[in-house]
Structures are given as structure tokens and as C-alpha cells.
């Protein structure tokens, strides 16, 4: 009996004092107050492939991969990340027809997820293409101009902060200027901050090779999250 008690005490000491990280992880698993909620929108999906490279690489596949890596990075900052999709599926709502998926229904369903999640931020992940000039390359960030002047100013500041972190962390991602963008459906009259991130050009051979590389996808997601964290003063665990 004494031997069992001694073993129990030793195990308890290890978990309480030697493994503080374990205790923190258990706090997270058991339930914690997130620093903020963010919706990650992986562009396209299902029968909507988005842009397509000459080698058949589809935008929808890479956006989902980067979105999942961003979700993992977000957890390291105690950010609750909600995904609009987690597989190769289109989204549906009342605008979908009896025969199946529609683009309008897909966009409405994405916006419904965003509104229901009550996030502070929505990040929509996309890829670009411009086959008439394959030299055009680089990631680019757009910020929505729907909303009050205060909201637009916040989105512009966020875009600049994220762009600077991408430029610093990933020089190969390019140095394209941030741009305002009107009439993005998912950001119309939104109560949340928003960014649309074009991660590179499928039409550019160098961008394509990087975007297909899983390690680059991870690095891109990490740099993107660092920029978000810098804007919202989030600390990494």
C-alpha cells in the first residue's frame, strides 16, 4: 500500500512541476477563453475548383491545405479558428437548387458560418492566376472597403501589418502592394474585420512550385498568423 502511495506521489510531482506545458495543454483541452475567434475561409471547393495551373493543380486544394496549416498556427496563439470547409466539398444553403450546388448558395453558406461564429476576424484564402503574363507573381492582400470608415481603416492597418510580416518572413512570396476591394460578398456589411489573401499565382512557374510545396504552405501560414498576432497583440504560447 505504501509503495503504491509513493508511486502516485512521484507521478503527481512530475505532472505538476516537471511538465508545466502539460498542465497548460490540459487547460486548453478542458476549456479556455480564447484570445479571439477567427474564421478561416478556404476558397472554392467541390465542383468549384477555382483557378487551375497548366499542370492541373487546382486552387481549391492548395487553399484548403494552407487554411488547415493556418488553423494549427492559430491554436498556438489561443485563437479559436472556425473553418468554412475542412474537405473538398462545396457549401449549400437555401439558394442551392434541387439538382445541387450553386455559387450563390455556396457564398451564402460561408457567410452564414461567419455570422454564426461571431468572429473578430475572417481570413479568406485564395490563389491568383494571370496566364496572359506568366511573369506576374507574388502574394497579395486585399482588404474590404464595405463598412464604416473606421472599419475600413482597421482592415487597411491589418492588411499592412500582415503584408509586412509576409515580406519579412517569406521574401520569395513577393512584395506586392495591398489593395482595397469592393463588393466582396462575404464581407458585405460585416461586423467583423476581414482580409482576402491571394497566396500567389498558379500561372507563374516559380509561384506554382512554391505553392505546391507543403513546407512552403506551412511557412506561409506561419507568417500570416504572425502578422495577425502582431496586429491584435496576441502572444504565442
PLM region spans:
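Catalytic-site microenvironment of enzymes
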Residues: 1-237
